[in-house]
């Protein structure tokens, strides 16, 4: 399979570059900016892209690649900071600009170049997305300008003449961002026309490759997989099951913190896939340990430890553990930025492999979230499973604020189900990234049937996002919110007030705990 390497210099758009490349049907991989030429050769890419970054190439602390990457003979495209890296390496001059460019700008494509730039073939003067404070003041020898903007006379250039065979191209703007009108065409021109890549990356080809890999890795050994009912674990389990059949042992732990009727729905669905699944009802154990615990961090840690204990008890003689690790998790561990600050501890089975001396099978570790869903469709997984909203590992424990009891969980389940039902019936469910109800540790005075009430307050939360990293609160219609509130107060005993959360992320997080 032909591939592209994206060297990461710390840009907020690095993952977006990789995703845009894959949308063209070409496999892309992200590696740190300081990856050695030897390592790059081992990957055998057909093209290299240098990402943007937050630093300046003329600073003493500038992050720069190994000079050897420019001698590999592999077509290269520098984006934003990547352009400046190329300019500096080949002897150009980069300095701080008196005018910074952030946001939309218009580029003018050079019209007098002979022959025409292959990168800008069929690209007219158009709007692009800029995000830079430095610019090229002097072009390196052996390069020519291919586009300019009002503030940057050399906002795109390419190797030419004596250096033409290097096939090195550079853009000061971001072709990966949707605001760059011809961004996809520019990437296509570079990867398909210039680098000569034939698109061969698809969900089908990925599945075929993974089935062979899983079968080879597992051999005749048994494999265990913890299933949550979420998209990632379901797709991972189905793929591994397709590869090794009855060698896979799936464990679904009902921790008493699931949504209404979730255990039954998940088991019914999984039974149609021919997977061997053990349902463990550990709800009493989880709720006993969570009794009187109000701290969200303590809740998460208790749930994590209890899950490991319950999971261990279901172990047979398995040698491998399936995990639904996704590509963003892999990138985070190798990126220039390093691991992010922990905002909340994550409940997962990360401690299981080392603790139980298990080897890992991670069939989704090369995929982004949208690609996981595409693979799931190819595997025949039902759309309502694939398009479910994200659900936190600790379940409803972090949506019942304060102490967690069965009574409070049941109140929340009933209210949450009404909210989701209404979203689906009005076609709004797929228009929001995530929606849920939160039971607050607050009671308020109300009046029902001429009687005073003192009952729970419920908050509704719905957000719009593309990746969950940032999010805006969803501006749902007022009449819709009124209908949901009215149903909840009338149908769910124990709630007399409903509020709607209008906080964005940041500063708030999507989940309340």
From Swiss-Prot:
Q: What is its EC number?
A: 6.3.5.2
Q: Name one GO cellular component term.
A: cytosol
Q: Hey, which pathway is this one from? A: Purine metabolism; GMP biosynthesis; GMP from XMP (L-Gln route): step 1/1
Gene Ontology MF terms: ATP binding; GMP synthase activity
Indicate the enzyme's highest-level EC class: ligase
Q: Which CDD domains match?
A: GATase1_GMP_Synthase, GMP_synthase_C
**Record domain Glutamine amidotransferase type-1: where:** 3-200
Name the domain of life: Bacteria
Q: Does the keyword DNA-binding apply?
A: no
Catalysed transformations (reactions)? XMP + L-glutamine + ATP + H2O = GMP + L-glutamate + AMP + diphosphate + 2 H(+)
Q: Where is the GMPS ATP-PPase domain?
A: 201-388
Q: Which residues bind ATP?
A: 228-234
Per its UniProt record, what InterPro entries does this chain match?
Class_I_gatase-like (IPR029062), GATASE (IPR017926), GMP_synth_C (IPR001674), GMP_synth_GATase (IPR004739), GMP_synthase (IPR022955), GMPS_ATP_PPase_dom (IPR025777), NAD/GMP_synthase (IPR022310), Rossmann-like_a/b/a_fold (IPR014729)
Keyword list, A-Z = ATP-binding, Glutamine amidotransferase, GMP biosynthesis, Ligase, Nucleotide-binding, Purine biosynthesis
Q: Which Gene3D superfamilies match?
A: 3.30.300.10, 3.40.50.880, HUPs
Which residues are annotated as active site? 80, 174, 176
PANTHER family referenced in this protein's UniProt entry, alphabetically = GMP SYNTHASE [GLUTAMINE-HYDROLYZING], GMP SYNTHASE-RELATED
Q: What does this protein do?
A: Catalyzes the synthesis of GMP from XMP.
Quaternary data: Homodimer.
Q: What is this protein called?
A: GMP synthase [glutamine-hydrolyzing]
């Amino acid at each position: 399979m032909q591939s592209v390497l994206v060297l990461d210099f710390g840009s907020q758009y690095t993952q977006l570059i990789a995703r845009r490349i894959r949308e063209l049907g070409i496999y892309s991989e992200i590696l740190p900016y300081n990856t050695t030429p030897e390592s790059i050769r081992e990957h055998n890419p057909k093209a290299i892209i240098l990402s943007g970054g937050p630093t300046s190439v003329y600073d003493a602390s500038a992050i720069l690649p190994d000079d050897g990457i420019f001698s590999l003979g592999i077509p290269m495209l520098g984006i934003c900071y990547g352009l400046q890296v190329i300019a500096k390496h080949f002897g150009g001059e980069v300095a701080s600009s008196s005018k910074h460019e952030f946001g939309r700008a218009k580029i003018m494509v050079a019209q007098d170049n002979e022959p025409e730039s292959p990168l800008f073939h069929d690209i007219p003067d158009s709007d692009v997305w800029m995000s830079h404070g430095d610019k090229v003041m002097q072009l390196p020898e052996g390069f020519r300008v291919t586009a300019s903007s009002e503030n940057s006379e050399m906002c795109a250039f390419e190797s030419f003449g004596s250096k033409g065979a290097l096939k090195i191209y550079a853009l000061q703007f971001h072709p990966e961002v949707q605001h760059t009108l011809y961004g996809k065409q520019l990437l296509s021109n570079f990867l398909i026309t210039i680098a000569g890549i034939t698109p061969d990356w698809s969900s089908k080809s990925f599945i075929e490759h993974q089935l062979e890999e899983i079968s080879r890795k597992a051999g005749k050994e048994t494999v265990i997989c913890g299933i949550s009912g979420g998209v990632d674990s379901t797709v991972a389990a189905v793929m591994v099951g397709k590869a090794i059949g009855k060698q896979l042992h799936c464990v679904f732990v009902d921790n008493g913190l699931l949504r209404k009727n979730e255990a039954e729905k998940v088991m019914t669905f999984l039974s149609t896939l021919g997977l061997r699944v053990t349902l463990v009802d550990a709800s009493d154990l989880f709720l006993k340990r969570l009794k009187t615990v109000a701290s969200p961090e303590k809740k998460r840690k208790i749930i994590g430890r209890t899950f490991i204990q319950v999971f261990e008890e279901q172990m047979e003689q398995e040698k491998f553990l399936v995990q639904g690790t996704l590509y963003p998790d892999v990138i985070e561990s190798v990126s220039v930025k390093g691991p992010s600050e922990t905002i909340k501890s994550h409940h997962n089975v990360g401690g299981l492999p080392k603790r139980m001396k298990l080897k890992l099978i991670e069939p989704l570790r090369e995929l982004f979230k949208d690609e996981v869903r595409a693979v799931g469709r190819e595997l025949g997984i039902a759309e309502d499973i694939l398009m479910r909203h994200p659900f936190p590992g600790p379940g409803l424990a972090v949506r019942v604020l304060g102490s967690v009891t069965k009574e409070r969980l049941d109140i929340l389940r009933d209210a949450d189900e009404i909210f989701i039902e209404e979203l689906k019936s009005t076609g709004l469910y797929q228009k929001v990234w995530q929606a849920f109800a939160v039971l607050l540790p607050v009671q308020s005075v109300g009046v029902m049937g001429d009687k005073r009430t003192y009952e729970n307050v419920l908050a509704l939360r719905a957000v719009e996002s593309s990746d969950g990293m940032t999010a805006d609160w969803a501006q749902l219609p007022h009449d819709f919110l009124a209908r949901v509130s009215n149903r909840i107060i009338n149908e769910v005993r124990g709630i007399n007030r409903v509020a709607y959360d209008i906080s964005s992320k940041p500063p708030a997080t999507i989940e309340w705990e």
